[in-house]
Amino acid sequence: MVFPPEAPFRFLNLNVLLGMTGVSFDQIDNWHGVDPKDAFDLQFCLEGRNCGTTYKQYHSVKSELDYQPNVVQLRLGERLNFEGRWPAYQIRYSQPEANLQLSMDFDTWDGFHWWVYIPKIYCHYTSFGSCRIKWQWNDDEGTIESPALHDHGWGRNLLPFRLPLNVFRYEVLRLTGGGFAISLWTEAPGRLELKNTGLLRWDAHQYQPMEHYECQVLEWEYFANYAGQKCRVPRRWIGKQNSNAGEFTYEAERRTDPRSIMGDGFLYGFDYQGQWSGSPGRKIEGEGYVEQLGRYFH
């Protein structure tokens, strides 16, 4: 989720991955258990205005994870508890080493949801909703309620090909008024485009599907990923989403350090200023975050 500007945080991202994904950072050498299929990867980032905290660690599905088949219920010791039933979910997260406690209650909005499907390879389903967060971090505590996203889906393990995606870029922008602009751009090796799509969700009721996303990088920097490999990371870029109804164009600048919890790629926050050319036209500015995977991002 991307927080409102008056909040003490920029964004929060919590990922739960079951099984090895097969990209270059996610190999048996990094898994110390017996069976790689037993891997449970927990990724977390809470980016504050002045500081942040992250977590990335493999756990064992068999020995550490409590879950119930055919229902939404996951428990990883005292660190994570995720449960609920459509349309409401409850998440409890604890990071004792950072003196952090979070309690999150997510209520799904009615109506439209965003679905991205690559046959036999990938499925990504986004639910939109409101999330009430009660937090305690060191000596500070508080409660925030804000629009949020719940992404869930599956991806086929492509490990036999030994080739990671050339690009996986997932952007989430908070729009004026609490809506979202989201985009997903994926490329296979050889710059073969797999899926490129987007969406403007103005509020709980209005939305505009977008057909294509473009990214023109204006300035690069280099950072080491989770595997210690040097990767190019955009510092400034121009993003563009197109549709028959109009064009959303914005210039963005990264405002946080790239967090390497995603292994082959990074998670980072940015500010942006943009323009929607459709009817009615409007200027849009705010904050967002990126999930970027792929060493060969061009």
Regions found by a protein language model. Give the residues of each.
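Structured soluble/peripheral alpha/beta segments that form catalytic or ligand/cofactor-binding pockets
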Residues: 1-298
